[in-house]
Structures are given as C-alpha cells and as structure tokens.
C-alpha cells in the first residue's frame, strides 16, 4: 500500500499555496494556483523565499463557496494510539483558507451568505470525532482487509477506501482525479475511536473500539430517518471491537442504522413527534436494496429491534416485522425486544434475556481471528444490526453487552483469561471497557442528536442511578431545544460539507433567503405580550377582585390560545433545513 505523507508545511504567497511534504528524504511539493485552482507537483527550491510558512497536519480538501474556492487543512492532531503498529490520529483543529485574497467583488448579501456557509463548515468541523491514519486504512474492518487482492493492496489509501465512511470524499474529489497527488491526502472518518492497553492476569493486550459513521444519508436526529432510494439507512454506524495480543488479533463487528424503510419524524415543537410511515412509496424495493448490500458486506443479518411495542413506536415495529416476512430471505432473522417494557422500574438485569436469546446465533456467527503467525483461524459470517428509534441510547447498551460476550470468547481463546474466569470479575478492565463504550455512546449521540447519550450510567457502572436519571432529563431538554431550534442549521451544514448541496461562485440567489411566514414572529410576540400582561395583572391588582380576575382570565386566555395556535402550526416555528429539501412522509 502506498502510504501518504505524515507531516507538511504550508507556504502561502499571493499567487499560490505550496504544500511541502516534510517526511525524511522527501522533497515533493504540491502547488495550488489560487486563481486557476490548478494543482501541480513541484520541488522545494521552487517555493519563493517570501512565502509565509506554517506547519499543518494534513489536507481535508477544497470546497467552493460564494466567495470562491477554499482550502481546508488540519492544523492540530492528537495521537489516539497505535493499531497494528500504525499511528491513529484525531484531527482536533482546522483552518479554512480562501483562494481569493479579497471579498470586495461580492455584494453585501453575497458576503453575508458566504459567512453563513463558512459558519456551516465550521459547525461540522467542530463536531468532535474526525480520525485518520497515514499508513493504515481506517475505513475497512480487519476482516475486509484480510480478504483483499494484491491489486487492492497496491492502491493508495484514497483509491481503496470504503466510500461509505470517507467524510472528506466530496472535499477531495479534485485530488481523486489526479493520482499523482494521492500521497498528499488521506481519507478521514467520523465517529469514535478508543485505544487502550489493558492487563488481565499479568498479560498485556491492546483493546480497541472503532465506530465508523456512514456519510450516506447523513444528518441529524429528526430530519434524517429511514432510508433513501439506494437503501442507505440514516445514522448507519459500523462498530468494530479489536483485540491484539502476542501477535494474534481478533475483531467483532456490529452495525446500527435507522429502521430501513421510508418514514419520517419531523420536529413540530412537541416533545416526541409522531412518526409517519409513507403511504405512497414502495417500501420493499429500498428495504431489499438495504439488506442485499448488508448481506454482501457482512453476511447473515440478525435484526435487533429495540423500539417500544406500544404507542407511537408500535406501527414501526409492526411494519419492520412485516417487511422482513415479506422479503422471505433466510439470511435475515428478526428479533423484537421492547427495551423500555422489559427494563422498566430499573429492571436492567432483564437485558440478559436478550443476550441469552441470541447467544446461539452469536456463537454461530463467530468473530474474525488471526493467530500469531498470520493465519486466519476464524471469520465472522454474520452481524447483529441493532436499532431503536434514534439508534443511540438503547442500541449502545445492547451492543456493549454483545461485544463483551464476544470479548469473553476471544480472551479465552488467546489464553488471556483462565478457564472459568469472567470479564465482569476483572475490575480494572471492566472500568476501561464500560467507560470506553459510554464514551462511544456519547460521541455517536452528539453527532446525531446534538447531546450526549442517555442511559450511559448503566453502560459505565452496570446499573442505573438517580444521578444518571437526572442527567438523562437534562440531556433530553437540551435535545428538545436543539432538535426544534438549531438542527435545521446543523442539517444544512452536513449537506454542504458532504456535497449534497453545491454552492455556485458569486451565487445571487441561495436558499438562505427564503422568507419566514408572518406567523413566525407575530404569534410569539402576541403570546409574550399576553403572558406578560397576565403577570402584571396578578401583581398589580385592580380595584376589585372581579376586575383583577377578568383581566387575568382575558390575558391568560389570550396567551393560552396563542400558544395552542403555535403548537398546532409547530412546523412553521422550528428551524428547518433550507439547502436540501428533506422528504416529507405525511
């Protein structure tokens, strides 16, 4: 595999960017013309002495906004650890640099739009969880990498990457077209990585957890649900647990993703909007495309549907079960487990019912195992696909339990655990394991829902606590606010970053200028005034109590009625995406 360069210097002049590879013995320089945007290879001596120089950690890519093209670079990185001897990095800071030296050619409206688009890019880049490696392919699992051809092994990181998980793929499209530039760029994944050195029975091993978020049908909690016409599921995450000990390595893969048919749950100011299943689209086509691709990539599928089997979630569970039955594919098994019902009143021990139910299937699927001499001893031929409504809180709890069961078998096979020993009894390792899975839950939740995960007290400690319930309540309130009043901007940011919306240079008519309905400002003002008058009437009593009561009833009724009208027209008041029209299923 042709690895990419590790470190760079960015030399900036008025005419060009010069990106110098600083690896030992390398003199390659990438020159980018700031006017024509042409990219060519040159050498260090061609860099003008007058250039302003600074170190950078890598190139994220380029993107066109209203003011012209921008170069996005990684300016800070933090080492996460080593995977099979290869350094894995977390990108922690970025810079967005304009090719143009001035924005004086823009109108005031264009400059304002450009600022909004820049803030959208920063919104995505500031979402924690971008990772990369310069000499290892983070987009593939160990098992996929072991089943590749010699031709695949010779490809550059950019050419061979699994495009589902390359979050800077759109930004690198121009680099992709020039193979001679591939050593200057690398794929960046989004999700979570934890790498820990652990010890059990005096035996030191590496335990790694990698979650890769798909960039297909990416978005935020209430605006992106279900699947698209290609069968890509919302909030799809591939999670791989890797063990390395004494030259041997093992891997266990699980997936999560939104319920894979056409449904929506648009925010409307209600705490929990009612899900809507499309009545006009043929669900089975997209449903089959989704599982056909999953079977090709992961083998047999066991669906663990954790949604409620009553209330607003019940129709989704029933439709999911019906579609699996209609598909009639022996490679797919469906298991419904009403998480909230089974674990109600703090009965979290009942999760063991689900683990025991799937134990035989998990043993049948196995895991990927390579011994110390490099020979493959076992392959994982099936995957658990877990989901709840958001594929976050309930899903993460179940995935951590299944991963622990696989880990028990792996460590016994590697002779790290003695016969009869349980992972749960290894207090030091259990703390590492639970905290990493809780951190994984928080990362996935922040990226999709805007807050940390719920129920992480159980993941961290193995039991629910009063403090955990309070934190869940706080996070739920923050989610409510963000989902209703800021997620439209977040969705637009993701669509811009991933290329779902393309900005035309000097564009005069962007969707950012869509006018708000008159109700957006008028009704909230009326409600605030009416409520304020109600309070004033209570504090400043009239001549008689009947007069005071009349005023209070009038202004109180006005505020209640106005609030009711606002709730009835809830979708007019939420922050909705403007760049790409999201599907409406109702």
Curated annotation (Swiss-Prot):
The protein's Enzyme Commission number: 3.1.3.64
Gene responsible for this protein: sacm1lb
Protein name as catalogued: Phosphatidylinositol-3-phosphatase SAC1-B
Membrane-crossing segments per the record: 520-540, 548-568
Organism: Danio rerio (Zebrafish)
Catalytic class of the enzyme: hydrolase
One GO BP: phosphatidylinositol dephosphorylation
Catalytic activity: a 1,2-diacyl-sn-glycero-3-phospho-(1D-myo-inositol-3-phosphate) + H2O = a 1,2-diacyl-sn-glycero-3-phospho-(1D-myo-inositol) + phosphate; a 1,2-diacyl-sn-glycero-3-phospho-(1D-myo-inositol 4-phosphate) + H2O = a 1,2-diacyl-sn-glycero-3-phospho-(1D-myo-inositol) + phosphate
Primary location class: endoplasmic reticulum
PANTHER family: PHOSPHATIDYLINOSITIDE PHOSPHATASE SAC1, PHOSPHATIDYLINOSITOL-3-PHOSPHATASE SAC1-B
Keyword Transmembrane helix part of the UniProt annotation: yes
Ranges where the record places region Essential for phosphatidylinositol-4-phosphate phosphatase activity: 451-586
UniProt topological domain (Lumenal) ranges: 541-547
UniProt cross-references to InterPro entries, sorted A to Z: SAC_dom
The keyword Iron appears for this protein: no
Single Gene Ontology MF annotation: phosphatidylinositol-4-phosphate phosphatase activity
Cytoplasmic topological segments: 1-519, 569-586
Taxonomic classification: Eukaryota, Metazoa, Chordata, Craniata, Vertebrata
């Amino acid at each position: 595999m042709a690895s990419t360069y590790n470190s760079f210097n960015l030399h900036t002049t008025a005419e060009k960017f010069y990106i110098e590879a600083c690896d030992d013995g390398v003199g390659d320089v990438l020159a980018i013309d700031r006017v024509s945007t042409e990219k060519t290879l040159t050498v260090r001596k061609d860099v003008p002495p007058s250039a302003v120089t600074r170190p950078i950690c890598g190139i994220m890519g380029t993107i066109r906004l209203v003011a012209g093209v921008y170069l996005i670079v990684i300016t800070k990185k933090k080492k996460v650890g080593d995977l099979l001897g290869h350094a894995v990095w977390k990108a922690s800071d970025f810079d967005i640099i304009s090719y143009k030296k001035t924005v004086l050619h823009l109108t005031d409206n264009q400059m304002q739009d450009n600022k909004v688009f820049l803030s959208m890019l920063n919104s995505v880049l500031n979402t924690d969880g971008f990772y990369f490696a310069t000499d290892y392919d983070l987009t593939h699992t160990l098992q996929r990498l072991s089943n590749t051809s010699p031709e695949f092994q010779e490809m550059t990181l950019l050419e061979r990457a699994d495009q589902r998980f390359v979050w800077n793929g759109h930004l690198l499209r121009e680099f992709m077209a020039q193979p001679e530039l591939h050593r200057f760029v690398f794929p960046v994944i989004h999700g979570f990585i934890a790498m820990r050195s652990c010890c059990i029975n005096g035996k030191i091993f590496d335990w790694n957890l990698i979650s890769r978020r798909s960039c297909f049908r990416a978005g935020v909690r209430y605006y992106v649900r279900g699947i698209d016409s290609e069968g890509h599921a919302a909030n799809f995450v591939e999670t791989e647990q890797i063990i390395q000990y004494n030259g041997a390595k093992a891997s266990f893969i699980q997936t999560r993703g939104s319920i894979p048919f056409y449904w929506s749950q648009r925010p409307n100011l209600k705490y929990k909007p009612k899900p809507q299943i499309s009545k006009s689209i043929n669900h089975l086509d997209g449903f089959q495309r989704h599982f056909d691709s999953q079977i090709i990539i992961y083998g047999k599928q066991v669906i663990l549907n954790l949604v409620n089997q009553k209330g607003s979630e019940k129709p989704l569970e029933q439709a999911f079960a019906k579609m699996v039955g209609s598909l009639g594919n022996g490679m797919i098994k469906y298991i419904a487990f009403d998480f909230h019902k089974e674990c109600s009143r703090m009965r979290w021990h009942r999760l063991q019912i689900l683990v025991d139910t799937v134990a035989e299937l998990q043993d049948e699927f196995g895991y990927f195992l390579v011994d110390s001499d490099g020979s493959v001893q076992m392959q994982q031929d099936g995957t658990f696909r877990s989901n709840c409504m958001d594929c976050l809180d309930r899903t993460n709890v179940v995935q951590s339990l299944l991963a622990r069961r696989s880990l028990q078998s792996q460590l016994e096979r590697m002779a790290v655990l003695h016969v009869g020993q349980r992972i749960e009894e290894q207090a030091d390792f259990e703390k590492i394991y639970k905290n990493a899975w809780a951190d994984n839950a928080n990362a996935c939740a922040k990226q999709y829902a805007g807050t940390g995960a719920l129920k992480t007290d159980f993941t961290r400690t193995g039991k629910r606590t009063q403090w955990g319930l309070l934190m869940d309540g706080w996070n739920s309130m923050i989610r409510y606010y963000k989902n209703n009043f800021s997620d439209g901007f977040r969705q637009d940011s993701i669509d811009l970053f991933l290329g779902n919306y393309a900005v035309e240079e000097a564009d005069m008519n962007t969707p950012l200028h869509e006018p708000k309905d008159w109700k957006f400002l008028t009704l909230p003002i009326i409600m605030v005034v009416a409520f304020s008058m109600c309070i004033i009437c209570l504090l400043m009593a009239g001549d008689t109590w009947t007069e005071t009561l009349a005023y209070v009833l009038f202004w109180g009724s006005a505020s209640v009625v106005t609030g009711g009208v606002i709730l009835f027209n809830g979708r007019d008041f939420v922050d909705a995406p403007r760049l790409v029209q999201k599907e409406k299923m109702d």
